[in-house]
Structure formats: structure tokens, C-alpha cells
Amino acid sequence: MPGGYDIDHFIPWSFVMNDELWNLMPMDSSLNSSKSNRLPQWDPFFRKFAGNQYILYKLIQEKPEIHKLYEACWRDNLHSIWAGQELYRPRNTKEEFDNILAKNMRPVYDSARRQGYEVWMR
């Protein structure tokens, strides 16, 4: 990405083994290197992450050209049933979106912690 940003996985790729949109975020390249294969602290990072995800969701819903890109991406990179049926359905409020995202991501995050993934202390 221009401007020194990478696309990072909130929950490390080595744990989720996918590139689904619900787990991706733009991140400063140097911070991405520092985070490496660790989990971000749930608080405060999840709130910021969910906010960025909601911005993406609104763009998908409101901009036909972005919705078209989302549709192409969805075919290859959106295999979680909950994401297609709940997260990216039309007309979610921000609160609904955040709750759906947290409800589905927190168990995956906690499972990664139990499997020994370290938390990135930033």
C-alpha cells in the first residue's frame, strides 16, 4: 500500500490460515514488523479494528464500484458462513456490526491464546 502501510491479520494468519476480510487491517509497516506473529491486545486494538472494519462495510454497502470489488473478493476470500450471513448483510448498525464481529472473533482470539500465541505489548 502507498504510504508505508501493510495489510495485516488481526489474528495471525498462521492460526486462522486464511485471508478473509473480517480479519484484515491496514497497519503501518514498522508496526506490522513489530507485531509479527503475535496477537494485538484485545483492548484497545479491537475497538479500533472494528471501527476500520465498519468503514469498509459502509463503503461496500454504499459505493457500487467497491461493492463490485467486494463481490469478486467474496468468491475467493469469504468462506466463514457467519461473515456472509451476518457481518456483511445490508443495514447493520455500527453497534450490530461490532457485536457480530466481536462475537465471532473473540473465541478465535482466545483459542489462539490457549494455543500459545503471545500478545503483542504495544
Regions picked out by a protein language model, each given a short descriptive name:
Residues M1, K63-P64, G116:
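Short, flexible coil/linker elements and helix-boundary hinge sites characteristic
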Residues M1-P26, K35-R47:
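Histidine-centered nuclease catalytic patch
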Residues D19-E20, Q61-W82:
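A structural signal for short secondary-structure junctions
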Residues S29:
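Long, His/Glu/Asp-enriched segments that create or flank divalent metal/ion-associated functional microenvironments
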Residues N32:
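Active-site loop ensemble at the mouth of alpha/beta enzyme cores that anchors a bound cofactor
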Residues K35-H67:
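Polybasic, low-complexity binding patches
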Residues W74-R122:
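C-terminal, charged low-complexity interaction regions
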